[in-house]
Design a protein with these regions (language model features):
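Conserved N-terminal phosphate-binding loop of PLP-dependent enzymes in the Aspartate aminotransferase
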Residues: 1-459
Length: 459
């Protein structure tokens, strides 16, 4: 049965509460209602097409409606859709775990979940219980976690506890466990600390100071390797990630790497940790794991950590955590095919090549005076919008400049999203160079249009 746009708009606004959305503002606007996708494009119910410039929230790898991923899903659906992993196993989850660990040979076990936030939540709980399982007396105080300024690791209570984004997390402060914040190398806004490497040195010294003083109370350090995504695509200079790992080893705290956003080719390698030869104790995977098809996440751990949970039943060393759809056959089957296609299609080399071209095209955006900084790692791009380049002052939130830019881009055929004052361009990984060039052209024209409006209204 076909429904008119007007009917769908009415029901959407009447019945659906959208995530991370101020619904009062949403109700005033004409919503984008997607009906289908093909390749790098999304199509709305009226047949208009849009380049998917945010990879449907950073998840899409091979494009929409990929025939091989579709076939893998159908093949599994003909066998079974779901059976529990609590006390029993299934074929796709076994094969996927084996496949993932081929990329992480120092790891030994895979614990499945369904969202990146859940993968982080699991990592935090494992890290906490690990110390208690080893020696609850000696490690009784190892209850704290360290994370970066402006950290974002998801929106469950544990993940929010290690988050540092004031806008998102402030209201929930009374619900959260204790977190220690350390500075992040946000180069664009840390001029006073000197060069990139001087900024890295400062941040690592601050982390070492915390670890030196409180290592006996800290269970783990958790970071997004190389790029803080939701913070506005803050790209860490080379050496920071490796430096954090060294400090964790020196002071005897666990190291958790949240690869949810940066993994599966997004940052230019299959996994971000490869770029600095880092071997964390726990790794969180999600987003691109199924190529953008279905919700799946995983937490990988070393044998040393896993072994701490082994014991007799009455020792209570069991990890009492699990989700209803943990290790679901449909999700694991499509994830297996996704990894196979990443390799077969040479996707990682393609991402590296396209990232170099994209960096060249993005430079033109600096011609627009409200573009303060452009940050990129692989196919993750952040364009920071400022009112004044000299002072780096941003526009007032109430002016909604960034929101107006994305609406203008949508009108021209590109879907993107802002993160505070930062426009993010996170394309489908398989997007062609011609399509990316078109996306950047739309970005330029949209920015130019809003600059003229802002100059008249706000500058």
């Amino acid at each position: 049965m076909a429904y008119s746009y007007e009917q769908l708009e009415q029901w959407d606004k009447q019945y659906v509460w959208h995530p991370f959305t101020q619904m009062k503002q949403y109700a005033k606007e004409r919503p984008l209602i997607i009906e289908r996708g093909q390749g790098s494009y999304l199509y709305d119910v009226d047949g208009n097409r849009y380049l998917d410039g945010y990879a449907s929230l950073w998840v899409n790898v091979h494009g929409h409606n990929d025939p091989e991923l579709n076939a893998a899903l159908r093949e599994q659906l003909e066998k079974i859709a779901h059976s529990t992993l609590l006390g029993s196993a299934n074929v796709p989850s076994i094969l996927l775990a084996k496949r993932l660990l081929e990329y992480w040979p120092h790891m030994s076990k895979v614990f499945y979940s369904d969202t990146g936030a859940a993968a982080v939540e699991i990592a935090l709980k494992i890290a906490y219980q690990y110390w208690k399982n080893i020696d609850p007396v000696q490690y009784a105080k190892k209850n704290k976690f360290v994370s970066l300024k402006e950290a974002y690791h998801g929106d469950t209570v544990g993940a929010v506890s290690v988050g540092g984004m004031e806008t998102f997390h402030r209201i929930f402060a009374p619900l959260l466990f204790e977190r220690i914040e350390v500075p992040s190398p946000y180069v664009y806004r840390m001029d006073e600390y000197g060069s990139e490497q001087e900024i890295v040195g400062y941040c690592l010294r601050e982390l070492e100071r915390v670890l030196e003083e409180q290592h006996d109370q800290i269970a783990a350090v958790v970071i997004e390797p190389l790029v803080q995504g939701a913070a506005g695509i803050i790209v860490h200079p080379r050496g920071f990630l490796k430096g954090v790992e060294r400090l964790c080893r020196r002071y005897g705290v666990l190291f958790i790497c949240d690869e949810v956003a940066v993994g599966f080719g997004r940052a230019g390698t299959m996994f971000a940790c490869e770029q600095e030869e880092v071997k964390p104790d726990l790794v969180c995977l999600g987003k691109g794991i199924t190529g953008g098809y279905l919700p799946l996440a995983a937490t990988l751990v070393t044998e040393e950590i896993y072994a701490a949970f082994l014991g007799d039943v009455d020792e209570d060393k069991t990890f009492y955590h699990g989700h209803t759809y943990t290790g679901n056959q449909l999700t694991c089957s499509v994830a297996l095919k996704n990894i196979e296609l990443i390799e077969k299609r040479g996707l990682i080399d393609s991402v590296k090549r396209k990232a170099r071209r994209l960096a060249e095209w993005l430079e033109r955006l600096y011609e627009i005076p409200i573009v303060g900084d452009i940050r990129q790692k692989g196919l993750m791009c952040g364009i920071e919008i400022v009112k004044d380049r000299r002072t780096k002052e941003v526009f007032p939130r109430a002016a909604m400049v960034e929101h107006r830019i994305i609406l203008e881009a949508r009108r021209r055929g590109l879907v993107i999203r802002p993160l505070g004052p930062v426009l993010t361009f996170i394309p489908v990984l398989s997007m062609s160079e011609d399509e990316m060039a078109e996306a950047v052209r739309i970005l330029f024209d949209s920015l130019a249009c809003l600059y003229e409006q802002a100059r008249a209204e706000l500058l």
